[in-house]
């Protein structure tokens, strides 16, 4: 009774007719299997058209489909495996392993469409998540259960920063990570997989990919697949989970394609009219509960660098912190190339972080801002034209700039310097001492690529020798 037949195929959208009593619900999975043609396709019901026909979105290529083919109503949404068995593996949007390994068998599967945690289950407290990365912890700290936007062009170090976060959460907090590759390059996913294996972090993370070559249905849903796997670790294993989404813009882009295929009237700039709803349904599930938390780091591509474009603008509304990577900083050889003045965080306040942290962070930003304003004068007239106070600001700013860099564990194989995890107390103490002028006598080079302030002092001795 629950078998229907395909009546129309329009690219990635397929119409299926069922008997009136067997009509599948919205978001139900419908399977089309034709072994002799090697077709094994899953569709997701998106609309009821009337006349016992449903309109579905395909999760993989519709090549080879024909009208009249049988389609099975599974009676449930797309469900994916969850649990410890998913760690160290790569999945597609349907939860099938795509890393040429053996099939993943888990005791539990979750549907990818799930309600966000109820208000009473959410944890109202705001707690900082220590990353061990100085520039982030000091100036744009992450909150547990928060959402962080990661902005940066090609080749400024987004992936390395993501890898270091995964490494630090695994090593220092014993936490797990889920990486969702949404509509990005397959080559980048492959590189990430190989680098994760080399750095030994792969056993602490699950990876889900729906890349550029996949139909829009897969790219629209793969974020939910990754989020569902992360929810299991939060709700059942009481973990603090890191969820990486690369790239949240492609999620919106896929939604726009699906919306057009479904015949919906476009909204501003041609985006789907349901843009805010779709984004909200994904983002509201990313939160802290009384059991654990999901902290999400989302790479955000900004089309034509226009921050008012509806896609990035809708994502901004959900963010708690932004980490902006700047090419000018990476060109100076300062890594991570996080812009200390452009990056910000909602939790950078004395009520949450304490007076000392807040004051040191603001003092550091003030010195860097003054240095930025003086750079034109320095470029035209040179350092000699500055007053003594201004010269002092410049010398401290240059030390701070270098001290904001640090060697990463995951980049050890390239740099040859062992990675450093810096606790927040050490970070605050180090910058406080530089701001107060305790280390004005040390050479600038001593502050570059070190962890704590003690290491800078040791490096200065070595340079002096």
Curated annotation (Swiss-Prot):
Produces ATP from ADP in the presence of a proton gradient across the membrane. The catalytic sites are hosted primarily by the beta subunits. It is a peripheral membrane protein. It is found in: Cell membrane. ATP binds at residues 152-159. One of its GO terms (cellular component) is plasma membrane. SMART domains: AAA. NCBIfam families: atpD. GO terms for molecular function: ATP binding; ATP hydrolysis activity; proton-transporting ATP synthase activity, rotational mechanism. It comes from the Bacteria. Belongs to the ATPase alpha/beta chains family. It catalyses: ATP + H2O + 4 H(+)(in) = ADP + phosphate + 5 H(+)(out). Its EC number is 7.1.2.2. PANTHER family: ATP SYNTHASE (PTHR15184), ATP SYNTHASE SUBUNIT BETA, MITOCHONDRIAL (PTHR15184:SF71). F-type ATPases have 2 components, CF(1) - the catalytic core - and CF(0) - the membrane proton channel. CF(1) has five subunits: alpha(3), beta(3), gamma(1), delta(1), epsilon(1). CF(0) has three main subunits: a(1), b(2) and c(9-12). The alpha and beta chains form an alternating ring which encloses part of the gamma chain. CF(1) is attached to CF(0) by a central stalk formed by the gamma and epsilon chains, while a peripheral stalk is formed by the delta and b chains. This is ATP synthase subunit beta. InterPro entries: AAA+_ATPase, ATP-synt_VA_C, ATP_synth_F1_bsu, ATPase_a/bsu_AS, ATPase_alpha/beta_chains, ATPase_F1/V1/A1_a/bsu_N, ATPase_F1/V1/A1_a/bsu_N_sf, ATPase_F1/V1/A1_a/bsu_nucl-bd. CDD domains: ATP-synt_F1_beta_C, ATP-synt_F1_beta_N, F1-ATPase_beta_CD. The gene is atpD. Its main location: membrane. Keywords: ATP synthesis, ATP-binding, Cell membrane, CF(1), Hydrogen ion transport, Ion transport, Membrane, Nucleotide-binding, Translocase, Transport. Coiled coil: none annotated. It is an enzyme of class 7 (translocase).
């Amino acid at each position: 009774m629950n078998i229907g037949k395909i009546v129309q195929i329009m690219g990635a959208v397929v119409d299926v007719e069922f008997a009136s009593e067997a009509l599948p619900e919205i978001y139900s999975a419908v399977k089309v299997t034709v072994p002799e043609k090697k077709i094994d396709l899953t569709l997701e019901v998106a609309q009821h058209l009337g006349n016992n026909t449903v309109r579905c979105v395909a999760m993989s290529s519709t090549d080879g489909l024909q009208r009249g083919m049988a389609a099975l109503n599974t009676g449930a949404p797309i469900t994916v495996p969850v649990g410890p068995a998913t760690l160290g593996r790569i999945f597609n949007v349907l939860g099938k392993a795509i890393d040429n390994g053996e099939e993943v068998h888990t005791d539990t599967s979750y549907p990818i469409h799930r309600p966000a945690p109820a208000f009473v289950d959410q944890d109202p407290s705001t707690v900082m998540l220590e990353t061990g990365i100085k520039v982030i912890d000091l100036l744009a700290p992450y909150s547990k259960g928060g959402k962080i936007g990661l902005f940066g062009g090609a080749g400024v170090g987004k992936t390395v920063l993501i890898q270091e976060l995964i490494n630090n959460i695994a090593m220092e907090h014993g936490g797990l990570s889920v990486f969702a590759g949404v509509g990005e390059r397959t080559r980048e996913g492959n590189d990430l997989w190989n680098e994760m294996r080399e750095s030994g972090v792969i056993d602490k993370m699950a990876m889900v990919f729906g890349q550029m070559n996949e139909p829009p249905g897969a790219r629209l849903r793969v974020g939910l697949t990754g989020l569902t796997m992360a929810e299991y670790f939060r709700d059942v294993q009481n973990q603090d989970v890191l969820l990486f989404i690369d790239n949240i813009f492609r999620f919106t882009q896929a939604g726009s394609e699906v919306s057009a295929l479904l015949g919906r009237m476009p909204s501003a700039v041609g985006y789907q009219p349901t843009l805010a709803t779709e984004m909200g349904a994904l983002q509201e599930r990313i939160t802290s509960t009384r059991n654990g938390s999901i902290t999400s780091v989302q790479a955000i591509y900004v089309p034509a660098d226009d921050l008012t474009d509806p896609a990035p603008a809708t994502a901004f509304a959900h963010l708690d912190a932004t980490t902006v990577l700047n090419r000018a900083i990476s060109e100076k050889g300062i890594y991570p190339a996080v812009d200390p003045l452009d990056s910000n965080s909602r939790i950078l306040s004395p009520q949450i972080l304490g007076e000392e942290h807040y004051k040191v962070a603001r003092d550091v930003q003030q010195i860097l801002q003054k240095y930025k304003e003086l750079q034109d004068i320095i470029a035209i007239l040179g350092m000699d034209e500055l007053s003594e106070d201004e010269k002092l600001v410049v010398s401290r700013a240059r030390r701070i700039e270098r001290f904001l860099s640090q060697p990463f564990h995951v980049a050890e194989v390239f740099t040859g310097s062992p990675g450093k995890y810096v606790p927040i107390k050490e970070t605050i103490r180090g910058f406080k001492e530089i701001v107060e002028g305790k280390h004005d006598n040390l050479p600038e080079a001593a502050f570059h690529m070190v962890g704590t302030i003690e290491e800078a002092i040791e490096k200065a001795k070595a340079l002096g020798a």
